[in-house]
């Protein structure tokens, strides 16, 4: 594939895995500048965007690029302003020939895995995360002696990954020779599949079972993957039996992960389970203030107050709003005021009268309209009287919410994201070809928005 084809595919996958607001604001217009020497240089329009993407989206973009090209590279976002200095630094470097990368990279035990900004010192503590922070610090201070496994769950962008990186940094600061691996369940699955294909399963097992600390993110994505669950079960057992620390994160507690083997579920519950909840107003303000101090920015308190009052869901969106404001101010050439802040964020802030639409809201309205029970949206029934309303509900979930395709599939009985894509395409085509049906869907959309 050419670099353009690679990046087109990366963007396609990113649109599925990243919230629509973040994708449209920060990812959509990025360009792949170069792909060499195990590094992907990605061009963005503004330095603010580059800094924020490097801090917050490096891991997920690294996983997506891996899925597309089949070997690991580290993404690095740079702005157009930084491009000249980057080229100057690299003009004298000799380009190394491409080599075939093994699916097993056993040199990923050090601090290079972790975002340098994600430490315990930069983690802002509040009522919603105090207990997870304390548990993570205890684990980092004494791996396998405090809580093993440590299971952290909570919504997107609340700080689970930050805590996992902080644990990694802390362990390696205390024990530089410790073997620590941070991965996601998706990356674990992809490496496992590739190891089977390349006849490297023993090397794969050596990598993941002969370590001191395993940090695995988004474990919920191993649901429905029987072979991966089998492999992870044995990996978990060997690490635990050898008194090695395991830290797991998820968007839900073990008991709510559908199609997870009971033997894995019970092991996840052996140690300590902690949940992170959305930050309160004081914590949101503290996060914004810490951010502007780190970046040495001058933003009026009333603008920060506006952001903290309007963005309440998670930290990632909070910091994203700040980055968007800075970019907007620079592009408009205007000083930051409350009025400019409201103008900059109008597309991502709901009006006071509006309510964030959930998939359950959509299922309820569509179910009432077509006389389908809520539970039937998640059932395996394929009769047309149920299957077609289910496709309509999937279509509306994609159109009216920021949930990723896998998340939408989960809410419809753990269906694969390709099923959601198919449903969206089918309903979109039916809308184009049938004016009566188009009006029907528009009426449903109005009812959902107005409930």
Swiss-Prot record:
Residue spans making up a coiled coil are none
Q: Which residues bind ATP?
A: 157, 159-161
* Example of a GO cellular component annotation carried by this entry: plasma membrane
Where is it localised? Cytoplasm
**InterPro entries (UniProt xref):** AAA+_ATPase, Chromosome_initiator_DnaA, Chromosome_initiator_DnaA-like, Chromosome_initiator_DnaA_CS, DnaA_C, DnaA_dom, DnaA_N_dom, DnaA_N_sf
The region called Domain I, interacts with DnaA modulators is annotated at: 1-71
Where does the record place the region Domain III, AAA+ region?
Answer: 113-329
Outline the segment boundaries, as ranges, of region: Domain IV, binds dsDNA.
330-451
The entry sums up its family as follows: Belongs to the DnaA family.
The record comments on the domains as follows: Domain I is involved in oligomerization and binding regulators, domain II is flexibile and of varying length in different bacteria, domain III forms the AAA+ region, while domain IV binds dsDNA.
In Swiss-Prot or TrEMBL terms, this protein is called: Chromosomal replication initiator protein DnaA
Q: What is the lineage of its organism?
A: Bacteria, Bacillati, Bacillota, Bacilli, Bacillales
